Amino acid sequence: MANSYFNENTLEELIEEIKYVYKSDDRPWVIGYSGGKDSTTVVELVYKMLLGLDPEDRHKNIYIVSSDTLIENPLIKIYLSKMNDLLGQAADRDGLPIKSAMVTPPPNNSFWANVIGRGFPTPRMNGTFRWCTDRLKINPSGEYIQRVIDEEGKEVVVLLGVRKAESIARKRRIEGRELANRLLNRHETIQDAYVYNPIVELTTDDVWDVLLRCDGGRTPWGSDNSELVSLYADADSGECPFAGIQAGGQTQSCGNSRFGCWVCTVVKEDKSLNGFIKSGHRELIPLAEFRSWLMSIRDNEEYREKKRRNGTVYRDKQGNMGFGPFNWKARKLILRKLLETQQVMGYELITLDELKAIDEIWDQELDLSRRVLVELYEEITGEKLPWYDSVSYTHLRAHETDQYL
């Protein structure tokens, strides 16, 4: 393969490098694991490295952390949960110092708590109001790493599945770090953390080569990487082969899709969600329909306040008056449609903890009855929320709020 890392290096040499870094100090490792091809490769290489060590040399803990934004594509969330369970079981079986964890945003700062509870407009396609990434993914992972630092009482090394070929922006950051000519680099935001990118030199083809050709595509924790290939292929509408021939005889590997949040409005089209649907996962159609509807109401003045949450009026560079958060009408409507979609799918799209957080936000900010949310939930699902009987009619009954719509 042209430009392959393995043209001049062997897999054994790569694992030896990882072993060298592991044994060089007593700093615990934290691996960011998304379930995608790159992070899976990192976890697989590290796991194999540990298996090759004598038990007495496995002298420090390795924490594998996955991030669940609570709005993950259901297929990806199910797969990731399965992999985390298998990893934990296999590590116990093999006596490895591996601990796996799944982090989520706190219920009162989740996507739905901010959109439905506080009325945050959904993130823009141009990225000017992309409030979600830090709250849903970066902060929960960062807080987890900080807890590891505090509990271990020492610095940590964070392993990432970043590669040179991934993007121009990432390439700039990687090459900038290489100027220091060392394997470990200071973490950009966490003071007592370093970063190690073990597969930085691997191409996409190299990654698939590791995943599919080593041990017949079986992971050390008992899964089959062909399942991962199927996920990528389905996300590409089922038309993505492992390696397809391009013009000039070059090959392009399957697996360039990214699995984002199913309700993400930063992109005009969710290619992976639509790809899954085209590949036969028609159970996801309600998600695509809800996402399209949510995008359609974002900039409709009927559903927006005139002022920002801090009471100021926003004007763009041309002096045009902008909108504030989603108004009460929009928030209640979004919740209704989300619950209806959840009923159709038979899959949890919003947790009870998030609903409780939204209930409390509405009570604090909107001067409305605590009964609004619990009665709406009962109307749509036919079930009572656990705190149904503990909230009182402090203001109006749910149906009496219609005068505000």
PLM regions: where:
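Nucleotide-activated chemistry modules centered on ATP-dependent adenylation/adenylyltransferase
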Residues: 1-30, 37-397, 405
